[in-house]
Amino acid sequence: MKSSKMECVRTLNQHNHVKTPPARRSFFSSTINGLLFPPNFPIRPKRLPSLRLSVRSSSSPQPQGSSTEHTTLLVETFHEHRRLKSLLKRLSKTGSCPLILLREDGDWSKEHFWAVVRFLRHASRFEEILQVFDLWKNIEKSRINELNYSKIIKVLGEEGLMEEAILSFKEMKSYGLNPTLEVYNSMIHGFGQKGNFADALVYLHEMREDNVAPETDTYDGLIEAYAKHKMYDEIGMCLKKMKLNGCPPDQITYNLLMRQFSKGGLLKRMESVYHTMISKRMHLQSSTLVAMLETYARFGIMDKMEKFYLRALNTKTPLGDDLIRKMAEVYIGNYMFSRLETLGVDLSTAFGETDLLWCLRLLSHSFLLSRQGMDSILQEMERENVPWNVTFANIILLTHLKMKDFTHLRISLSQLTHSVEPDIVTVGILFNAIDMGFDGTGTLEAWQRMELFYKAVEMNTDPVVITSFGKGNFLQNCELAFSTLEPEERVKKIWTYNNLINLVLKHKGSYGQ
């Protein structure tokens, strides 16, 4: 046994020369029974959209005046778009200054000005926003109005530029303009997001003195800010203040509360709000439904997870891949492997097939050690022209390894590189098999010829596969050896498979010891 392992390692470390790999076959044997790899499924071509030409009937000519106006509008729109494109191009140049550009142009339309503001936000040039606003509004005094100040204060608040927002707020009042509900909301929410709740509450008090009544949106922003800073007790106080000020929480507020309590892992509070909503016959938003489902999956409460999963399924609420993986982990943890098949089929029927859902269906039959079940899924994938990938391949390899079926493991490994490139999980499967007595010399030589070990390490297998089967000895040894390195050593070079394997050998003395 030991001599076989050392022979495999010697084969891996032979670097005399690299032969040109033989030409690959386009397809494997179509035999699936026995868990051989299916054919190299082609990617389905996308349909080209049909092109339709709209031909105007000559029997119904348009009025001459209407045609002329339409043409003029098109020309003006074209030139407006060209001027805006030119302005943004000048603004994107290194060292450009919007103040200089505005002076050069003389003035900008409101469309051009707000496009510049959006550009500056996207480019993180926040300090220039208020400067160019001051210059632009002074070119035409009618621009000093509540709407423009409301928009600029909202931008500043959203970007956390509260000192600039305060200046604009004071300047607005100095012009005799009355701050609107939107302006106060921007100030309160901006301070709240930064965690400065003292100032946020000052503006909440000031708006009431100015006879601007807070609305639920005002308090909703505060609630969201409290949750961001994990100040959940203050959320309760905020709700009481809402009710005392004649602004009872509405459906949006309750949905927000449930999402924030869910995110914070406050299960009892989340459920309490949910029961309140049920008693008030309020609608549960799809994002709230997903948040509740995520919470139950995170806590592993399977009965409630399934209850809200069925509700999401019935309402056609899409679920993200991460949530689907969490649900799969709950089923795996409870040894309910057949539910993975049901989960994959249900979601495929509702939203369409994905690689993750095919993966779950394969895993279901893999855990049940059902060759017939896996064959059935592989045949279905072949009929649907599902492109083959390393996740599917590794599930089959891991199943062979779990069964200690070295015959089919060898066949599958020999066919593997005809369709997909191995990743670190595949390499780990081979070394774990060698540790169990498998003769991996042929596979190591084949991978050496294709120069796999000189390539950067990649992890392309879906994480749910690792969760299902575990990391195995090889990956655990890799992590252990890697953790012994200094942080700068880990990032100073691109890690190849050779680098990583040699590190493991150096750390362990020899693999498998």
Where is each model-derived feature located?
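N-terminal targeting peptides
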Residues: M1-L167, E171-Y175, E182, G195-D199, ...
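Pentatricopeptide repeat
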Residues: E80-L84, S109, F113-W114, I129, ...
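Inter-helix linker motif
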Residues: E140-K141, G160, G176, G195, ...
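Ankyrin-repeat interhelical turn/loop motif and analogous interhelical turns
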Residues: L161, N196, M231, L266, ...
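Tandem repeat domain/solenoid detector
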Residues: K173-S174, Q193-D199, R208-D210, E224, ...
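Alpha-helical repeat scaffolds
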Residues: C238, M270-Y274, M305-A312, R339-L347, ...
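C-terminal interaction modules of eukaryotic adaptor/scaffold proteins
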Residues: G440-Q513
